[in-house]
Swiss-Prot record:
GO cellular component, one term: cytoplasm
Entries under InterPro entries matching the protein: AceGlu_kinase-like_sf, Asp/Glu/Uridylate_kinase, Uridylate_kinase, Uridylate_kinase_arch/spir
Record-listed ATP binding positions: 9-10, 44, 48, 139, 145, 148
Name of the molecule in the record: Uridylate kinase
Highest rank taxon of the organism: Archaea
EC number(s) recorded for this UniProt protein: 2.7.4.22
Catalytic function, reaction form: UMP + ATP = UDP + ADP
Protein family (similarity comment): Belongs to the UMP kinase family.
Length: 233
C-alpha cells in the first residue's frame, strides 16, 4: 500500500529526545518494508513556542506560519538523520517533489508547505495528490470522539465514521472555546472530497504504529487505539 503518515510533533519531538526520534525511525523502517511510506512531521511544542515569541514581537500571522513551517522541517531533518540511509536525503518543499522522491524507494519525510495549513492538512493533500491507499494521522488521542474528551467526560469514541460525519464533528468541536479536534477542518474536507481512507490513532507508542499499520490497515478492522474514517460501507 501507499501510505501517507502525518506524525504529530507533540509525540515525535517531545522534549527533543533523540531516543524518541530513533524509536520512531525504527518503526518507520519496519512499516516501509511492507509499504511505500511518506511522512509529514508536525512542529509540536517548539513550533508553538517560536510562534508565541513571534506574536509577542508583533509578527503578522503569515510570518508566524512560516516560522511554524521551518520548525516542522527541522523535525523532518532530525527524523531523516535518525533514519539514515533508509530515508530520502532531501526534504520535499512541495507535492510534486514528494512524488518524485517517492520513486527512490526510500522513506520520504517532509514538513509544512503552505501558510495557513496544518501538517495534517498537508498530509491529506499529499495523500490526495498521490492517490494514497491510506492516510494515517498519528497523534496523542486514541481516535475521534463525539466531542473533545478533554472537555467532555461523556464524549463517545467512534470505531468507524464517514467523512461527512467527521466534518460535522470537527466543526462542532472547533466552535467550542477551548476544545480541540483530532483532525483539523481542512484535512477533514480533503478526506471527504477525495473519499480517502484514513485512520486517526494514538501513536505515542511507536511499536503500536507498526502493529496497526502492518497488521490491521489492509483489513480496516476496529482498533482500540484509533478510529477509521471511510466512505465505504
Amino acid at each position: 500500500m501507499l501510505i501517507v503518515l502525518s506524525l504529530g510533533g507533540s509525540i515525535l519531538a517531545k522534549n527533543l529526545d533523540p531516543d524518541r526520534f530513533l524509536k520512531y525511525a525504527n518503526a518507520l523502517r519496519d512499516i516501509s518494508k511492507k509499504h511505500t511510506l511518506l511522512v509529514v512531521t508536525g512542529g509540536g511544542e517548539a513550533a508553538r513556542d517560536y510562534i508565541g515569541a513571534a506574536r509577542a514581537m508583533g509578527a503578522d500571522e503569515v510570518t508566524c506560519d512560516y516560522i511554524g513551517i521551518e520548525i516542522t522541517r527541522l523535525n523532518a531533518r532530525l527524523l531523516i538523520s535518525a533514519l539514515g540511509h533508509d530515508a530520502y536525503p532531501e526534504i520535499p518543499s512541495n507535492y510534486p517533489e514528494a512524488s518524485k522522491a517517492m520513486t527512490s524507494g526510500k522513506v520520504v519525510v517532509m514538513g509544512g508547505v503552505t501558510p495557513g495549513q496544518t501538517t495534517d492538512a498537508v498530509a491529506s493533500i499529499l495523500a490526495e495528490y498521490l492517490r494514497a491507499d491510506l492516510l494515517t494521522i498519528a497523534t496523542s488521542i486514541d481516535g475521534v470522539y463525539s466531542s473533545d474528551p478533554n472537555c467532555d467526560p461523556c464524549a463517545v469514541k467512534y470505531e468507524k465514521i464517514s467523512p461527512e460525519k467527521l466534518i460535522n464533528i470537527v466543526m462542532a468541536i472547533e466552535m467550542k472555546a477551548g476544545s480541540k479536534s483530532p483532525v483539523d477542518p481542512v484535512a477533514a474536507k480533503i478526506i471527504e472530497r477525495c473519499k480517502l481512507d484514513a485512520l486517526v490513532m494514538d501513536a505515542r507508542n511507536p511499536d503500536l504504529l507498526v502493529e496497526v499499520i502492518c497488521g490491521e490497515a489492509a483489513k480496516k478492522s476496529p482498533v482500540s487505539c484509533g478510529t477509521w474514517i471511510t466512505a465505504k460501507k
